[in-house]
Amino acid sequence: MQTRLWVTGYRSFELGAFNDKDPKIEVIKRALKENLIDQLENNGLEWIITGGQMGTEQWTCETAIGLKKDFPQLKIALMLPFSNFAANWNQEHQVKLTDLRTRVDFSEALSKESYKSPIQLRNFQAFMLKHTDGALMVYDPDNPGKAEFEYKAIQAYQLEHPDYSLKTIDFDMLTDISNEIEEEKRPW
């Protein structure tokens, strides 16, 4: 049973998705929704725990918030590795993160300090692994990005914790979902 799921993956810039109307986001959100519903219905999912990065993590929060009407037991935690996490982002992106933090069930920065060193990011990974039963990643190992660090950390963790699951949503799956969406939009 996976009651606590870490969801992470590509950042928006890695996918070339720079605005909320980008069709790639619809595809990724559909993939997330399908996978989260499966976890809710079949694996006893109670908590989605994610970070605040622009891209997969924020899309996960938005998707999960939308699922709460059908799955009111679902809880969402948006965790940050350090305080002032979005300090270098433009105003629009900072406001969006602040808004998301008010709409989830729990949000906290693990370190009360501003960014000091990569150890804060490693501590964040360790926290996420320790406080979840498995991970869902929008990630394709054949197309590495910044999420490769999380992917490798999860694989290393699995060596010591073989019950910790990892499911990836890769580009082949995203292509299939994109094709489904296109079929649905066709006027028959």
Swiss-Prot record:
Domain of life (superkingdom): Bacteria
Pfam families named among the record's database cross-references: YpsA (PF06908)
InterPro entries in the cross-refs: YspA
Stated name of the protein: UPF0398 protein OEOE_1093
Family indicated by similarity: Belongs to the UPF0398 family.
Organism field: Oenococcus oeni (strain ATCC BAA-331 / PSU-1)
Gene3D superfamilies: 3.40.50.450
Record field: transmembrane: none
Taxonomic placement: Bacteria, Bacillati, Bacillota, Bacilli, Lactobacillales
